[in-house]
Amino acid sequence: MTDRLAPATLVFREDGTLVSPAYGDIYHSAAGALAQAEHVFLRGNRLPERWRGRRHFTIVETGFGTGCNFLATWAAWRADPSRSERLHFVSVEKHPFSREDLRKAARHIVAGTTIDASLVDELADAWPMLTPGLHRVELDAGRVVLTLAFGDAREMLPSLVLRADAFYLDGFAPSRNAELWSVEVFRALAKLADEHASFATYTSAGDVKRALENAGFSYRKVEGFAGKRAMLVGEFAPRWKLRRHEPPRAFDADTRDAIVIGAGLAGCALVERLAARGWRVTLIDRHAELASEASGNRAGVFHPLVAIDDNFGARLSRAGYQYALSRWRAFEAAGHAFSRSREGLLQLACDEPEFVRMQAAADALGMPDELASLLSREQAGEQLGSETAQGGWFFPQGGSLDPTKLAAAACATAGERLTRLANVEVARLVPREGGGWLALDANGATLASAAVAIVANAADAPRLAGLRHAPVQQVRGQLSMLPAGSAPKVALPVIGDGYLIPFADGSALTGATYEPDDLDPIPREAGHRENLVRLAALLPHAQVDSNMLADPASLKGRVAFRCVASDRLPLAGALGDEAAAAANARALSGAQPRDLPRASGLYGAFGFGSRGFVWAWLAAELIASQLEGEPWPIERELAEAIDPARFLLRALRQGRVG
């Protein structure tokens, strides 16, 4: 289970210096936090000159604290007309401040300086929920990307996937927080370093110098800040080979263009994330409209999963949920609307034993209320506006939305960078001479050509990409539309074994059946009946129209097909080269994911099951980051859990390839 976070406590000394009661140390010099950041970390890393003319520049920091180093760097980047296109700032923090404490601390730091206080508010407004793991925060219209790693540096740093250009070695003094300055931490940083990546730190302690040298960094002493005799600067310059695997680089292509096949949420999220980085995208779909298949329901629900062991599925859903919310807020701020409900979402326990398990998870995980809180039966009924048989989880930022409108909003943000080919079916993907991919129709005619191809067309993706080791199946789901006046009256979407989504006109949506390998596209009376029985079990005290129960065939409905992987996790990322793996199967029998050969320029995003809302944007951001050589938005172990080549890897380890 992921360790719960212990937030920092905001305490000021009489001289206005921030202090940590837990470590008995100050957050910054009494001579000025921002001046210290500029002297030690910016000048110490030869910034801003080193980021000039770059597509992106990546800084890794140990100890976010009050954010003063980040704010100083952001301000310097904004002021530089020759700045990099994008600035990535990745920071590890074991004890993050709450949103409002961060706002107070940062406002105090920038008061009386040249830094615009609006930067503090933009940062605080985007500050994530205090949950363990990685959090992607996009600022300055997406040009500045802050990736926060909440947790112990010794655990978080090895989980990062990135290539660092500079390191800010901050944090409390080595005498107060020795583990942050250990050989273990510096070796983890060394695995992330680009050739000759720089570092700077305010300390010149002997143990720190020895640990840096041990990890492959060279150093020299320079004048410290505010009368401090010395500080250390240096670079990654190992005298021996330290790394089995090199940090990731950007995909090598002459052009930044991609073919995305499938215009559901997975494909439209990819369009948005790639276009935001300047890529040109051709979106191909066999239907005339966006989101016409599994993403085409009138509404769907979104919420994270909660599990007492905080397994991969729970962690991925939490990360995807929070990242999706941040992207949707950006769409809404730009004027796009997609009927996102605002009342929250209620997940009811099916019975008393399940509620007891929920209580155990709540006690073990200690989640912040803005993520989820556990309500008693009485509290749940009050929240829902209807009596319930059990309590359950309340997700205040969960809810429902219109997937078709969301897909349209995502594509609208791409503007002229998007080319749509509708009513077109891709029969084959073939390698392009000289690199890249061609999408061909059934007659062999070229539909599109690009450096990169991404299959996001659900259950047909393995066929199109030529994957033998991608076990997905189609699961039929039938939902039922309940006419106005016939549905139970509830104040917000409610789920359990089934769901009910209310609409403003008094109608509602309920469902859905779960029928593996049933490919009948026509709604059936039996499906409506099953949905009504499930609704009655979900809300046993609610009134359901007796006429509807007597004649379920009178209901309107819709059938869609979920694409579900055998391990119930999505497939997102670079696809494996199965032919190359088969040719080298014996050598790869003990391989790690990073050892597998990959099909150059071929990626996938499919197998989202019923969780397209939660997983689509995280998967798209992961793929875009892989293509650009940017820091990944999730931990390595989570990326490997959804790696499309994971099934190939298992087959190799079991001797089933070749």
Task: Name each model-derived stretch.
Residues 113-116, 308-311, 337-347, 371-412, ...:
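Helix-loop-beta segment of a Rossmann-like dinucleotide-binding subdomain
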Residues 256-283:
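N-terminal Rossmann-like FAD-binding beta1-loop-alpha1 element of flavoenzymes
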Residues 300-383:
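Dinucleotide-binding Rossmann-like beta1-alpha1 core, especially the glycine-rich loop
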Residues 393-442, 447-448, 452, 456:
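Helical element adjacent to the flavin cofactor pocket in flavoenzyme catalytic cores
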